[in-house]
Amino acid sequence: MRAGLVLVDQLIRSGVREAVLCPGSRNSPLNLAFVEAERVGRVRLHVRTDERSAAFLALGLAKVSRRPVPVVMTSGTAVANCLPAMVEATLSGVPLVVLSANRPLSMLGSGANQTIDQAEIFGTHSVCTLNTGELALEGAAAGAAGELRDLVRKLINAATDPIDGGGAHLDVPLREPLVPPTLDELSLWAGEIAAAEDAATTEGAHDSHAPSQPTRGPRKLPYGQVEVDLSRRTLVIAGSVSDVAWARSIMDELADVPTVAEPVAPAPDFPVHSAAVDMFSTQVVSDGEHSAVTIPEQIVVIGRPTLHRGVTKLLANKDINVIALSDTRNVTDVFDNVDEVGSTVRPRGEQPESWLQVARAISDMGVNQVRDGLAEREPFTAVHAVAVVADALRDGDLLVLGASTAVRDASRAGLPFDGVQAIANRGAAGIDGTISTAVGAAMAHAHADPTAIRAPRTIAVMGDLTFAHDLGGLNIGPLEPRPDNLLIVLTNDSGGGIFETLEPGAENLRTFADGTAAFERVFGTPLDLDFAELCAGFGVEHKLATSVEELATVIDEHAEIGGSGITVLEVKVSRRGRQEIEKRIAGTR
């Protein structure tokens, strides 16, 4: 029990301010230690009964707060349920910390209940994997407090490392007794442990030979500076990054360069609409009277762009000089043709005015294509719905986007915008845990300014498959903190809308000659869910919109009245209509 108190005390001293707990017997020492810490105001807790949802809740909290957030669970498959969130955390550089209880290691392979080999369960998806071994076993902790604290420091430093940070895992074998004799004794022990560390820290401050607490100096970057010759036709492509502030600094240096930015990137000074990216792959464009070279000579990649096939086509062109910039060791080089890698830039020269004119014209064409494509409001699709949401965004809003169609539709709607932070789980681009991520993100967003009269708004946008995949994210107990102002826009097209525009959605692949459904069965995957009833079961407010006008009205009303917890705004849209909209936007009506 004392080991749990030591570990939790050090986690808080190392920057933890929120923690997600899952019920279990083996993790009792950790859970009770966290409850005591919350009782005295040191941390805020969130309890969830589903470990997968819990891990994504912690991911959302950590993604927005940029602080390490532990998720605590018992042994066995409970730990395995954290794998999807750990994959996303490590690929996105988010400090998610899995704190798993375990049986003593001597029991592994003995047939003991709820015992699996979980020490290395996350493999390369954990940036740091540690095990307390026998240090946390009852009777050993009294003399092992210093070693336990060192393990926590190492764990948190690894998770929050600006270059190599991400998901981290501490496995904690524990042996009975797992609970204190009384809660009063628990509080007494916690006070003694904290006081002893306070005294040691104070004494260490006067002892030049004592180890000091690690401090963060100026941000280190993995790569050096790259010179960018702006006299060449240059296009910047900005994708998802670990540190938005770093990306912003790069984009400020390249402010005069045409930039295609994904919704989760900072807003560029010279935006180029993503709908027009394909035109940059054409060597010369002519209207019969005038012609212009539209292919760039060089591309500067910031972070990891993954959304647009037109961008992928450009990056595959080996005749274009590609400069890849990253603030982590992960470098985007899908086609093995990156010419230079860096973390900062030194621009020289200026962009040719003729190139800037071409880029503006191409971007305007993209904007007009989208505007014309959405001018007709029938069929009403998710693309229309996301455009309405984009128009309704205000300074200070946080936008959480589903990783499938929602983030792509947001790009069509013109994001990113100044004053609006957008996030999406694009590390592994899975739809897992999107509701839970949004709930965590919304609470961290509101917690950033606890003095605000009204909680800032978080809007999450996702399709029905993404929503249904994480319904458990709405399962928030009556004793738990919950978002004050979260609007979830659920675009319900009864199935997988993204496949309508991919190769499996071709007309000749939809149905066999005998009428057997191919596309609809395994790609369309229609749902028959009553989302109003589902929301009612979780005690969540549900609203419905069936047109552009209704959707805009409900969003405006929600903004004016203010949030009252979680509201799900279901938008009934057409799935087959997406093909028609895509053709309109592409100009091939």
UniProtKB/Swiss-Prot annotation:
Residue ranges, annotated region (Disordered): 198-222
UniProt cofactor(s): Mg(2+); Mn(2+); thiamine diphosphate
Record-level GO BP terms: menaquinone biosynthetic process
Top-rank lineage group of the source organism: Bacteria
Cofactor note: Binds 1 thiamine pyrophosphate per subunit.
Oligomer and partners: Homodimer.
Record-linked PANTHER family: 2-SUCCINYL-5-ENOLPYRUVYL-6-HYDROXY-3-CYCLOHEXENE-1-CARBOXYLATE SYNTHASE, PROTEIN PHYLLO, CHLOROPLASTIC
Protein name listed in UniProt: 2-succinyl-5-enolpyruvyl-6-hydroxy-3-cyclohexene-1-carboxylate synthase
Organism: Corynebacterium jeikeium (strain K411)
Lineage: Bacteria, Bacillati, Actinomycetota, Actinomycetes, Mycobacteriales
